[in-house]
């Protein structure tokens, strides 16, 4: 398997997750709101909406862009399944194209 990334999770991260798991708010709640506000400030953005997955983020992107059954979206099959699924969830049709073997770009 080709390694493409690695997480850095320390004891502070684990403690924060355990704290949320023990709380009443497994989803939503004050920690999510704080994270969105902190991220918004960090990015210098007026708005921020975090999602539970990359699939959800890609789907929301398609909906925000107004993709529908009349749209075709170019993508590569050398990606996570979420990429093409989000296109389909938005009503558009994925068009698969080759990528450059050296850069992995379309």
Regions found by a protein language model. Name each.
Residues 63-106:
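PLP-dependent aminotransferase-like
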Residues 1-64, 68-69, 89-90:
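Conserved PLP-binding active-site segment in aminotransferase class I/II-type PLP enzymes
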């Amino acid at each position: 398997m080709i390694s493409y990334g690695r997480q850095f999770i320390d004891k502070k991260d684990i403690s924060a997750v355990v704290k949320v798991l023990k709380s009443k708010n497994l989803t939503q709640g004050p920690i999510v709101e704080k994270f969105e506000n902190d991220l918004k400030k960090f990015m210098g953005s007026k708005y921020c909406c975090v999602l539970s997955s990359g699939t959800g983020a890609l789907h929301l992107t398609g909906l925000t862009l107004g993709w529908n059954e009349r749209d075709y979206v170019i993508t590569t099959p050398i990606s996570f399944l979420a990429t093409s699924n989000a296109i389909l969830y938005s009503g558009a049709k994925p068009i698969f194209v080759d990528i450059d073997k050296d850069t992995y770009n379309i």
